[in-house]
Amino acid sequence: MSTTTESTHDGAGETLVVAGGQDWDKVVEAARSADPGERIVVNMGPQHPSTHGVLRLILEIEGETVTEARCGIGYLHTGIEKNLEYRYWTQGVTFVTRMDYLSPFFNETAYCLGVEKLLGITDQIPERVNVIRVMMMELNRISSHLVALATGGMELGAMTPMFVGFRGREIVLTLFESITGLRMNSAYIRPGGVAQDLPPNAKTEIAQALDQLRQPLREMGDLLNENAIWKARTQDIGYLDLTGCMALGITGPILRATGLPHDLRKSEPYCGYENYEFDVITADTCDAYGRYMIRVKEMWESIKIVEQCLDKLQPGPIMVENGKIAWPADLKVGPDGLGNSPEHIAKIMGGSMEALIHHFKLVTEGIRVPPGQVYTAVESPRGELGVHMVSDGGTRPYRVHYRDPSFTNLQSVAAMCEGGMVADLITAVASIDPVMGGVDR
């Protein structure tokens, strides 16, 4: 739009007029007081490449400016929390691991910590189990952050970080497959311990994987940290300060990007995190770039923690030594492929009838958990992942509710995006890093 300037006769200064001869200030005022009917409503998603799955964003826009932004969720609802009420306590792990599918080990650990707290066996968990849990969670944190940075880069037009991120994630998933048998949703963490011990060569494989991960992490930083285009698209975008985070219950990298060093691994340690040396990464920018830098640096801290896990990993049991809670932890996979070695079967069948009955009841009915309710929480890659668990004294949960950080953090979309541009909304949502499996459950 071409403009000209005219001097006013009263000497007050200059008046900016548009090509049509109108005063520019009057044009702006007219636009601001325009009929809301001139604004349009646009649905971004649920089928859209930039909404992280089946997230629907209902946008009211005026030109390129977002005047109102609302989230539409529920397109990935699976009824997992309700299904848990019809499954044994141990079977529940198979369901919860599928909620936030990018960080399944955190779902499993939070659930198992709650069951163990109800059982009163938190202090009886073997040291080896806690080390394995911490190690798997930190490896999972790396893989989850790599996906966040890879997809975030792709959505802003940076394709190379996507390839770098997924190449690094493949290293971690291959390691998970070697240890648990599955790349994702492994149901490896169990109430009282873990499903099986590490393979004989696991320490060597993990050390090699850490060495291989350093290259893609360095490459990701080299590509984006000082990239002028990346900084222009992320700095001062998706702004949310500490007051906003506190009002909305926001946690994770979004909260730490305001300068508050809130991390449950430090403030309320679990699984022995108090025995590990690592830093809580913060920033003071309150924007998408600060959240990006936090995730990059947190991956390096996770590598430090996993290295300490390898040093702490000592031989020992991988399940609590309580026959009323856990199956025997030293089973070997027999010819039937079900973990019943001939020696174990002979011991069960050749022992007392009571032992056989107990084993049968444990397998078919599951453990009984004393009545009560607990809340446990872990620091997932997206923030505080909490579990409110209620038991009525039976073999199944009465109620299990997950406080998923993706669900809570999505509340910040309106605060981050209203008043900004449509293109910047993509940046803001990518910096939140929501996983719809955890949002809808």
From Swiss-Prot:
Coiled-coil annotated spans: none
Subcellular location: Cell membrane
Catalyzed chemical reaction(s): a quinone + NADH + 5 H(+)(in) = a quinol + NAD(+) + 4 H(+)(out)
Signal peptide positions (record): none
UniProt xrefs under InterPro entries: NADH_Q_OxRdtase_suD, NADH_UbQ_OxRdtase_49kDa_CS, NDH1_su_D/H, NiFe-Hase_large
Cellular component terms (Gene Ontology): plasma membrane
Known EC number: 7.1.1.-
SUBUNIT field: NDH-1 is composed of 14 different subunits. Subunits NuoB, C, D, E, F, and G constitute the peripheral sector of the complex.
Role according to the record: NDH-1 shuttles electrons from NADH, via FMN and iron-sulfur (Fe-S) centers, to quinones in the respiratory chain. The immediate electron acceptor for the enzyme in this species is believed to be a menaquinone. Couples the redox reaction to proton translocation (for every two electrons transferred, four hydrogen ions are translocated across the cytoplasmic membrane), and thus conserves the redox energy in a proton gradient.
Family: Belongs to the complex I 49 kDa subunit family.
Protein name as catalogued: NADH-quinone oxidoreductase subunit D
Originating species: Mycolicibacterium paratuberculosis (strain ATCC BAA-968 / K-10) (Mycobacterium paratuberculosis)
Gene coding for it: nuoD
